[in-house]
Amino acid sequence: MRTSHFAAVVLSALVLVLPLAARAQAPQADVFDRVTHGYAVSEGGVKIHYASLGKGPLVVMIHGFPDFWYTWRHQMAALSERFQVVAIDQRGYNLSDQPKGVENYDLRLLVGDVAAVVRHLKADRATIVGHDWGGVVAWQTALAMPQMVERLIILNLPHPNGLLRELRSNPEQIKNSEYARNFQQKPPTDPTVFFGMPMTPQTLSGWVRDPVARARYVEAFGKSDFEAMLNYYKRNYPRASGADLPATPEPPKIAMPVLMFHGLNDQALHSDGLSGTWKWLEKDLTLVTVPGAGHFVQQDAADLVTSTMQWWLAMRVPK
């Protein structure tokens, strides 16, 4: 990591967070059998499944690729002591509807799915949490519907400006994004589409370390649509890079407080994309970089992520 990019990070936040993380341990009780399940109806009648735990101000959590609502199990268990924590299955995954056609995975519709869940739960505003593609959706929800997003938490997904900048100018990020080109160009039936392997429930869940959790992932991916998973890339991910990537209008500044985590061993999204994030925000940024954690930082560093979320939200949500 190029540490010179991060001189402006709010170090005082880390001074407060790290002692807390050392003391706190994420609850060990699994949430799989404790959550209640429901569905919100989005545009076109698409049903979005969610798992809910706890009561209080609403927190909506959005997974990425390849994943499902259960990725947030550690955070849900802890945050549910003060919040209603709702983790969705994005369209195409697990128990949510899986409409055919790449056009049905446009970012506008993915944002609409989040809004449908918030409205279904009769809330005006929520803390929105997103990882990977869920981070893309979370950023865009904050931009398109700022009145609905009270606070924003992003895991391993740079601000859109930072990601586009790196795709234009950073050879490492351009190389790291070759997998996305593969997803855009190949069908899910190609035997090499998934990092040289076929897409199966087993290969897609190979990154999950805990054997009990992995079995649940295999089951969830067995219910998912692999073509839908790739449609996120085919519809929304830039098809060009380097000098060929066209300029895009700069979006407005993010209007709410932001907490970001980034596992520094991420092989897909370079940490250089974080540099300058504060220039694109109106309010405070707390940035937590996590050495030793990879792309799935919410699981690789579950205790740190969970305790930091608790601390950060406690500072901003009245009791």
How should these model regions be labeled?
Residues A8-P19:
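Bacterial N-terminal signal peptides
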Residues L20-A24:
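Sec/Tat signal peptide C-region and signal peptidase I cleavage site
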Residues A26-G38, V46-I48, L53, L58, ...:
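Flexible "cap/lid" subdomain of the alpha/beta-hydrolase fold that forms the substrate-access gate
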Residues M61-G64, A87:
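Structural cue for short, hydrophobic secondary-structure segments
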Residues P66-H74, V85:
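Serine-hydrolase catalytic-loop signature spanning alpha/beta hydrolases and amidase-signature enzymes
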Residues Q75-F83, H120:
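A short, Lys/Arg-enriched amphipathic alpha-helix followed by its capping loop at the start of a domain
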Residues V114, V305, M309, L313:
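Hydrophobic "lid"/C-terminal helical patch
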Residues A293-A302, T306:
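Catalytic histidine-centered segment of alpha/beta-hydrolase-like enzymes
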